[in-house]
Each structure stands twice: as structure tokens, then as C-alpha cells.
């Protein structure tokens, strides 16, 4: 995702809207805030390598990690900023276990939507928000390009970070 943003910047391709799911929601939000590619790379390094967000193990009744580190790192990075105040339009998605539907986060506090979008079931605890139990958006829509096309006109570029089937080793 960061590589695609870097290539677009180098090629002078303007980006006027960003959407993301799971890890892509954090990268997209940082870009939509107007951060440079090097800053986004550094923040991701601070969160995922230096911050060790997945090292707060717990008895796996709900998940293998408590999720407090990641929760605090995302909240600290994005502060109390609102999605609707971002310089570039942004949304991210999470899976709503309460309504058994996709939840689109296009307004409200950034860190809450991003934290919900990256709550991988079993790995980390779900996000409880406004009476909803939210998990990683990839459970229902790992590539929200279709949602972007439904909402906005113009070209949509979607970045799928899942490996191609032909790249996996057969069993």
C-alpha cells in the first residue's frame, strides 16, 4: 500500500479519496491526513515493530492478545481527530457482528474506525462502539474498491495485498 502511494506521488497522480480495510485503514488514514510517505512508513515502523502491539498475550478466551498496545498506539497516533475533518476524503470498513453487516466509518473519531477495521477475530479483541461489536473489515470486504465506486465517480485504484493463489505452495 505504501509502495503504491509512493509510486503515485512520484508519477504525479493525484489522490482525492482513500478507503481501507484492516492495516490499509491505518495507511489510508495517515495519507488522508496529509502525511508524507516517509512519515507514514516511520509511523508504521513505530507501531508494528517498535511498539510490538501483538506482544501483550493473554489466555485466549476471546483472542490471543489483549489488544491494549495496538489500541493505545493507534489512539496516540491519530489523537481525537475526526474522519470528516481529514484533508482527503476517507472511509474504512469493519464487520459488525451485532447487525451481521458491514459498517462504514466515514465520520467520527478516526482511531475508533481504524481500530475496529483492524480487529482480526481470534488474534485481537473486537471493538465495542455505540452498541456494536466490530471486527476486521476483511471478514466481509477486504478490498472496499466496490464501495468507493458506489459512492464516488472517477477512477478507482484498489490495492490487494493478499497473495495470488498461483504464488502459494500447494499442499
PLM regions and their residue ranges:
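Patatin-like phospholipase
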Residues: 1-21, 29-171
Amino acid at each position: 500500500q505504501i509502495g503504491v502511494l509512493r509510486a503515485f506521488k512520484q508519477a504525479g497522480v493525484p489522490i482525492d479519496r482513500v478507503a481501507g480495510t484492516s492495516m490499509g485503514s491505518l495507511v489510508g488514514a495517515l495519507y488522508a491526513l496529509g502525511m508524507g510517505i516517509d512519515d507514514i512508513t516511520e509511523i508504521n515502523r513505530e507501531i508494528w515493530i517498535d511498539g510490538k502491539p501483538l506482544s501483550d498475550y493473554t489466555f485466549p478466551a476471546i483472542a490471543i492478545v489483549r489488544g491494549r498496545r495496538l489500541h493505545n498506539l493507534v489512539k496516540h497516533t491519530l489523537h481525537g481527530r475526526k474522519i470528516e475533518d481529514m484533508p482527503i476524503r476517507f472511509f474504512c470498513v469493519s464487520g459488525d457482528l451485532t447487525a451481521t453487516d458491514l459498517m462504514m466509518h466515514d465520520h467520527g473519531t478516526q482511531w475508533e474506525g481504524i481500530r475496529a477495521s483492524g480487529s482480526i477475530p481470534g488474534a485481537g479483541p473486537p471493538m465495542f462502539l455505540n452498541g456494536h461489536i466490530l471486527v476486521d473489515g476483511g471478514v466481509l470486504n477486504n478490498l472496499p474498491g466496490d464501495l468507493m465506486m458506489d459512492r464516488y465517480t472517477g477512477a478507482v485504484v484498489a490495492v490487494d495485498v493478499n497473495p495470488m493463489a498461483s504464488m502459494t505452495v500447494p499442499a
